[in-house]
Each structure stands twice: as structure tokens, then as C-alpha cells.
Amino acid sequence: MRPAQLLLNTAKKTSGGYKIPVELTPLFLAVGVALCSGTYFTYKKLRTDETLRLTGNPELSSLDEVLAKDKD
């Protein structure tokens, strides 16, 4: 039984820095997919939605009307 114990001890030694349990791999995968899809859909919403006023949008701006009333 002694040689088997020696083989187990050598197999347990790893040269890597982090020891991540195998059970956490699906969790990391799910979080990665959620982050990627959240980033994609947020970017898509901000890029294509014309009702958001992120940039100067003169069609939806009532600033000119307010300034014109102020001058009168």
C-alpha cells in the first residue's frame, strides 16, 4: 500500500498558483455568459434607441423653443 500512497501524494502536488474547485467551473461559465450578454444588450440598446437623448438630437430637443420664448 505504500507505493500507492506515494503516487497519490505526487499527483496532489500542483505547480499552479490558484486552486479552483471543479464545482465552480459552471458558476464561472454562467457568470461570464451573463456579463457578456448584459454588455451586448446594453450596448445594443444605447446604440439603436432613438428616444434616448445621449447625444445632441435636434428633433427631440425643445431647448430652441424655450430659448426663443426667453428672448421675447
Swiss-Prot record:
InterPro entries per the UniProt record, alphabetical: B12D (IPR010530)
Subcellular location: Cytoplasm; Membrane
Lipid bilayer topology: Single-pass membrane protein
GO BP term, example: negative regulation of protein-containing complex assembly
Cellular-component GO terms for this entry: cytosol; membrane
Pfam families associated with the record: B12D
Protein keywords: Cytoplasm, Membrane, Transmembrane, Transmembrane helix
Transmembrane segments: 20-42
Family classification: Belongs to the UPF0495 family.
Annotated protein name in UniProt: UPF0495 protein YPR010C-A
Taxonomic source organism: Saccharomyces cerevisiae (strain ATCC 204508 / S288c) (Baker's yeast)
Organism lineage string: Eukaryota, Fungi, Dikarya, Ascomycota, Saccharomycotina
